[in-house]
A protein has these predicted regions:
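Conserved phosphate/anionic-ligand binding catalytic regions in large, soluble enzymes, centered on
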Residues: 29-37, 158, 177-199, 298-310, ...
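Flexible inter-domain linker/hinge segments
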Residues: 111-179, 333, 339-354
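Iron-sulfur cluster-binding cysteine motifs and their immediate structural context
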Residues: 71-73, 478-484, 572-592, 603-621
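Short amphipathic, charge-patterned alpha-helical segments
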Residues: 237-241, 389-404
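Gly-rich Lys/Arg/Thr-decorated short loops/hinges at beta-loop-alpha junctions or inter-strand turns
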Residues: 26, 145-160, 211-223, 326-331, ...
């Protein structure tokens, strides 16, 4: 069956969503939606419509990236524009059913926007401020199409890129990718066309394509969202890559911690084979391409391409020296193309729309769009897709909505645990590979963590280095021992130990480690240390010289103190919450924290009524008046 035949049949099914007589309810059930309660919402909708006379269908869709607005529900009612509702729960479902599905009140107070522009209220979703700066290529289908329905993907142009690729020769496909100037989105930014060409030129009858979906960065979930929301875009990209290099087999290496992504990939694979877009005769062309899913154990190091190959082969995930590169000697000694999920998902768009079209997007240095996972102290967290070269300030303040609770911005950590921490003065940095590298950060897999005045940069560097120390494979000495020694120094700093000479030693160790480590983990792990030393050196000095943590985070340098003038209510909230029984009352009923007993868990600060706000953190600890350091000192 040709792609034209598949498209015509799929379009009929797709059109019924917006043009038929059935009321359609689309519920976002990606992992983020499920964490917010979307499955309970799904069951409540089923219960509420079970006795209705009018036809109603319920479908699961992926995530459109608005994770902080979940659960999201789209209701498509014949004769009305499709409306997306946010923060839906079991209590609001009956309202939507009674007021809108059964009647004509669209419940605008619950609406985020319309899916298809219709003018008036509510606003069209792409016109929302957090969307207006975005350009959605990879996420074009996410949250609107069902990942469990291949016809939805085909009806929106899916597999047309593969159909065009099959009419081209490998050199022409590689030429289109070269014109696009696409750089790999796995972190290193290597030109995608060069990888394809090297693998195509490598001699051998057996070659492989590997999709590296081992996403291990804290706070990163771009690959997971794509696999859960639009798995066919990745499968199509793998088939195009396989045809370009002469491979008949592909592997998706995905961590076991992504069960929903695995399930939806399995469903998509089965449907693709059934439709003939994968398998023994792809779209009737005679080309054969099969894909297998390999589950990983979740080690961070497995994301390094040679470690990924070792894991697929059933060996320990240890990186190896390069050359030879995987394009020369990869999986089972055969030429292998290893690409990230996002890189592969771009191939269908580049082939169907042309490399020049793709190259026109971006800032000239880098092309196309970049996918980022926004996390941390932001109003809007989730996934965003922006043209390469967009400023960090636009992503954080215009799309992310700025810092929560009126706090002050302090830093943004970009690039995962091996990325750098950049200060406010660098918020105009464009997000392209070279600009970020010049600033001391990396694009990485696309994680962005925003920090405010309550984050300690010394402790932040310690946290990321601690993560890398646990995830290091231990194969090379610079990484294994270097991280351990640097971590020890940082742990001393967070307790006020050490002197200023240690800063230079720490910097030298970090630079040596970058130069001598075997793989990217060891080479990049010092980045948080080097950038915090470069941009936040004053915080290190405060810890070492003043024995003070400016953010009042480091426990050994911080004390909890109850302000007598604010504790006039004399309640027992803090007394009851303290696990160490360190809080007692004086003769006037005012509370005192015994500093010797206090474990600095912060429970007292959490439970103190906000109208009193009597519990504060002080640093250095000498700020606590001597007469109020324990009940006996009164």
């Amino acid at each position: 069956m040709t792609i034209k035949d598949l498209y015509q049949k799929a379009r009929i099914k797709w059109s019924s969503l917006y043009e038929g007589d059935v009321i359609h309810i689309l519920i976002g059930t990606a992992t983020c939606g499920r964490a917010a309660g979307s499955m309970a919402v799904l069951e409540e909708f089923k219960r509420c419509i079970s006795n209705m006379d009018v036809p109603v269908s319920i479908s699961e869709v992926g995530c459109m990236g608005l994770c902080s607005y979940e659960p999201l529900v789209i209701i498509i009612k014949p004769g009305n524009v499709a409306i997306c509702y946010h923060h839906i729960n079991e209590q609001t479902v009956p309202q939507l059913v009674e007021r809108y599905i059964k009647n004509d009140d669209p419940c605008l107070e619950l609406a985020l926007g319309t899916v298809v522009g219709g003018g008036g209220e509510p606003v069209h979703i792409p016109e929302l401020e957090l969307f207006s700066y975005q350009q959605r290529l990879l996420m074009r289908n996410c949250g609107y199409n069902s990942p469990l329905e291949i016809d939805h993907y085909i009806a929106c142009g899916g597999y047309s890129g593969l159909a065009r690729a099959l009419r081209l020769n490998p050199a022409e496909i590689i030429g289109e990718v070269e014109k696009s100037c696409l750089r790999g989105r796995g972190g290193a930014g290597y030109p995608a066309a060069d990888k394809l060409r090297h693998c195509y030129m490598s001699p051998g009858d057996t070659k492989y394509v590997v999709c590296n979906a081992d996403e291990g960065d804290p706070g990163a979930f771009m690959d997971r969202l794509l696999l859960e929301s639009d798995p066919h875009s990745v499968l199509e990209g793998m088939a195009i890559a396989g045809y370009a290099i002469g491979a008949e087999r592909g592997f998706i290496y995905v961590r076991e911690e992504y069960p929903l992504a695995i399930h939806r990939l399995q469903t998509a694979l089965a449907q693709a084979v059934e439709k003939g877009v994968l398998g023994s005769d792809v779209l009737g062309s005679g080309y054969k391409f099969d894909i297998e899913i390999v589950r990983g154990a979740g080690a961070f190091i497995s994301g390094e391409e040679t470690a990924t190959i070792a894991a697929i082969e059933g060996r320990r995930s240890w990186p190896r020296h390069r050359p030879p590169y995987p394009s020369q000697c990869g999986l089972w000694g055969r030429p292998t193309l290893v690409n990230n999920v996002k890189t592969l998902a771009f191939f269908p768009l580049i082939i169907s729309k042309g490399g020049d079209w793709f190259a026109s997007i971006g800032n000239g240095k880098d092309t196309g769009t970049v996918l980022f996972a926004l996390a941390g102290k932001l109003v809007n967290t989730g996934l965003v897709e922006v043209p390469a070269g967009t400023k960090l300030s636009t992503i954080i303040f215009d799309i992310g909505g700025g810092i929560r609770s009126g706090k002050q911005f302090k830093a943004v950590q970009i690039g995962g645990p091996s990325g750098g921490c950049l200060p406010q003065s660098l918020l105009d940095t464009p997000v392209d590979f070279d600009s970020l590298r010049q600033a001391g950060a990396i694009m990485g897999s696309g994680g962005i963590i925003v920090m405010d005045e309550d984050n300690c940069m010394v402790d932040t560097a310690r946290y990321f280095l601690d993560f890398c120390s646990k995830e290091s494979c231990g194969k090379c000495t610079p990484c294994r021992d270097g991280i351990h020694q640097m971590l020890g120094i940082l742990e001393d700093f967070t307790t006020g130990q050490g002197d200023l000479s240690e800063l230079d030693r720490l910097e030298r160790m970090a630079e040596d480690m970058k130069q001598t480590s075997l793989c990217g983990l060891g080479k990049m792990a010092p980045n948080p240390v080097l950038t915090t030393l470069r941009y936040f050196r004053d915080e290190y000095i405060a810890h070492l010289v003043e024995k003070r943590c400016p953010a009042r985070v480091c426990k050994e340098l911080t004390a909890y103190y109850i302000l007598p003038q604010k504790c006039y209510r004399g309640c027992d909230h803090c007394v009851l919450a303290c696990p160490a029984e360190a809080i007692t009352g004086d003769d006037n009923g005012l509370k005192v924290i015994d500093q010797a007993k206090c474990t600095k868990c912060g429970s007292c600060e959490l439970v103190c009524p906000p109208e009193y706000n009597a519990v504060v953190r002080l640093s250095p600890v000498s700020l606590v008046p001597p007469e109020r350091r324990s009940k006996t000192s009164l």
